[in-house]
């Protein structure tokens, strides 16, 4: 897996393709174990969750070992934490257990250009994410709720995969990045090495 996890990004991991490959490996009786090379800075929380689930299904049938490349951060770590064993280079950048949302705001630009927009909508959230205006308080609250739910799920997945408590994961999470060597000391990685 090389790139960010996404269901749509041309430059990232297309989660559906990865999931299809993982399912084929699960069904292939000649495959006795899977080494999954992860070199990803992260990506979509949704795509990462889908791949995480596919890795969990695969490891019910055969051992899954993750070998981390230069980085396995955020969504890259999300995917990795489902493995039976995680191997990282001493300098691998990993962890980054955190989630953020980004809604562009082009209002300043449209104001400068003298552009204005009329919006007709069915309810107050119908144009949520409209870049022609800033978010209002209700939208910020809603987005924060989604971010918090996603973060809680990410922490839970890491706790389950690493056989640690959510509290232990939260102490080393908060979006922080660790080297492979430091990650091994805190339990995010099992073995230092490479392929």
Model-derived regions: residue spans:
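Alpha-helix initiation and N-capping motif
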Residues: 103-106, 166, 195
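Small-residue-centered hinge/linker elements
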Residues: 1-66, 71-77, 81-161
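Amphipathic alpha-helical substructures
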Residues: 165-193
